[in-house]
Amino acid sequence: MRSNMLKIIVGLILIVCWMSTSRAQQVKHPSLLYTSERISQAKLRIQQDSVWARAWEEIKQTADEELGKKRLDKADYLSAVFLMTGDKRYFDKLREILLHIVHSKAWASSEMLARNPAWRADLNVAHKAYLSAIAFDAAYPELSAGERKQIAKGLYRLGVEPLLGDWLCEPTRIHSLNSMGHNWWTSCVCMGGILALSLQNELDEARKGAQTVYEYLPEWFSFAGDELQQKAKSFDEAGGMYESLNYANFGIQEALQFFVAWTNVYPGSTLPDIPQLKHLSSFFAHVCYPRTGILYNINFGDSHKNVAAESSLMLLYALGIRQPDMLWYIRQVEQGQHRDGYFRNRPMGFFYTPDLKGAPDVPALAHSQLFADFGWATMRNSWQKDASMLAVKSGHTWNHSHADANSFILYHKGVDIIKDAGNCWYPNPQYRNYFFQSQAHNVVLFNGEGQKREQQYHGSTLRGYLYNLLDGGNIKYVLANGTGPVSDHFSRNFRHFLWMDNVIYLIDDLKTHEYGEFEWLWHPGGEWKKRGADVTITNGEAAVVVRPLYPRLLALSDFVHDYPNDLYWEEISAPTEDLKGTETYYSLHLPGKFDRVKGVTAIILKDSVGQKELPVMEKREGKDWIGLRITFQGKVTDLYINQLADGRLMHSNSWIEADGWNTDAYLFAVTYDEGEDPAKPKEVFVAYGSALRRNSDSYFSSLSKLFYIQKGDAKKLDLWISGQPLVNAYFRTGKRPVFLNVNGEKATVNYKEGLVKVKYNH
């Protein structure tokens, strides 16, 4: 206790000493972002590399075009060129702009000022503060003392005081992290902080403001959300932010720019302890899709697939948080592929793009990742370009996070072959009437309805969740629970994503409070063509087959009246994301009214558009179970769905007998060679089971129900297990394995009478 108290006292003394030193320290301009070190590196680059020389010429051309104007918009270009060349023409223009803008009455918009209480600072004010800081920092050495003071006072009044006053500092603060703690908060606070850093030689209140930003910024990263207004935790434990890639990157970028400026102004200073920073790089990598051409990124929510996060990664790299996958990611981004990027021909990209020569060919990351805190998951078969990737979302709904619980996007051979409809400019009625709503996503509707429209503004009190991600190579699985957001209609809205070899099975477990009509929505990212009971979606070299299997097949022909019990389809016209036209999405309707449905749809990933041979899928049923037998290229998989394991039983366990297998598992699959004995499977998948038996033999036993994948050969047994922190389970193998891997880690082989015992506590 005494030791801890001593440490606290010493720490407080050091902080006081540092703050006293920083108050006395004069900032040597320019030192915010375009530092002398960055300038020297850039000059060397353009001498050695023609690509960088061309980028420099484009920056200079933009600055030259601004010499005949008097606007702040491109002050960063004027500043960069002045610092690179020393040409006083650019300084004169910066000086003219700065002396002009400080006479403005206010930077806030009339719409923001009309709010109650008035919002004196928004993103526009933040952007002007940033550009003003860059301009003042660059021009500072050439300005007279009187000009410095005049400009500093004006910029403090216009930028620092409203930004930090509204968003951070007492007694004028009107915002909290609970009400506006998303990307706006970091932009307003951190751009106000950067401007304050630039003004502190002239104004001690600016110095204090910058220190306040430095002190409170870690709280934004650590915000845990709340219950009363259903605000999401900002950052997932595995990295990343729930708002969508677009706004996650923007909010993070603004925070990191402040930290970079701070460490430049105060050399030798250290970053606060922010654990979330170390996971950002892997988050951005996991939600991207490398392809031939522009790098795609998951566009859940208010993002676009062209938007990338190279800016945040460059800033992390500049701060010394360096991981090889950062370089890999930055190298994938094409110049100019989105609006706000750090590209070579823009000042921040010009100064902060790291040397990419050491970038790996592929990142050293797992093929699958679950972001459980905000309900995203990605699964891919490779990190190579144009591979296959499935992205799943079931999490929060509010603001930039759409009404898309249990939705997904499928990327295959370079395209989003099953896509998200996207978004548009927010004031457009199509945004709130279509793009935000369930109808714009690949979900199940009941009586034509998905999530309530009010969730856009008020959020969903009950959110969606993702659980039990498993990746066993050719077998991958994740469970989505979207019941909460649609609980006005549904008591069960579960969607299982089971990816086995070249087929992804969507298994929907649906229960509603009353009888009604179910429909499945599909947003194709290519040409939709029905052939019999299958639908083929084709885009360039990519093709997938969508094959509904349960509760009914798709009606075989357009004469749907001849197939009164089968699924019929509806073509629905909707706006394209750019609002320049319309596109068609599809609804597959189940005739009749039901209150409980099991839906199974197979999505077959074709190796080529012309591939003729496809997996043969035989529908099979028994007492209390439904299933499939899938045969393809000498391999057979028997897939079983336990009808008793869907919550209909209270205290009785859900035991079934299926083809000689006895189990309480919700879902299980066994794979074996064609013509061989199913009792000797090469691969086993079990979802939510405590036992799998055949005859008198136990194949799997656990007191608690688990999810697992089992694969092995004569020497090795691989197990991937989820479902409980404490596992004490047995798995059957033919012989004692030499090696045992559990969840990718080596484990001790504990073998007896044909069973391997696995015990751990996580």
Label each residue range with its predicted role.
Residues T172-H175, L199, Y247-I418, K593-F594, ...:
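Carbohydrate-active enzyme catalytic cores, enriched for enzymes
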Residues N297-A309, I417-N442:
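Aromatic/acidic polysaccharide-binding cleft in carbohydrate-active enzymes
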Residues A24-Q25, Q332, C424-H762:
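CBM-like, beta-strand-rich accessory domains located in the C-terminal region of large
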Residues G239-L245, Y266-T270, S394-T397, N428-R432, ...:
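Active-site rim elements
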Residues S31-K43, Q47, W52-S282, C288:
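Aromatic-lined, polymer-binding surfaces characteristic
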